[in-house]
């Protein structure tokens, strides 16, 4: 399934520092992979798209990783209603995962 994680950063510098683990999928539960990362231009929040076996796995992973630097809400994507095209001008994940 696909899962959205909406992050509202309470401490953006700390959240971005800790979030490197999320971007690299370090310590992610089995079957859980980050696919897309969309931070706001003011660094106050971000939306991420995950592929996972469960919403609970993503919720626990982002909560444990970001800690008190972010308030996170996760939900399953409704695949019947959702759509996607690759946004032009965004770098591929391999460019930021190192």
Please place each PLM-identified region on the residue numbering.
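A common structural junction motif
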Residues: 27-28, 65-73
């Amino acid at each position: 399934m696909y899962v959205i994680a909406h992050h509202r950063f309470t401490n953006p510098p700390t959240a971005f520092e800790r979030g490197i683990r999320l971007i690299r999928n370090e310590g992610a539960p089995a079957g859980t992979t980050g696919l897309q990362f969309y931070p706001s231009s003011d660094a106050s929040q971000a939306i991420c798209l995950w592929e996972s076996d469960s919403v609970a796995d993503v919720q626990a992973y982002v909560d444990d990783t970001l800690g008190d630097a972010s308030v996170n809400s996760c939900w399953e994507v409704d695949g019947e209603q959702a759509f996607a095209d690759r946004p032009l001008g965004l770098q591929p994940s391999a460019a930021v995962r190192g």
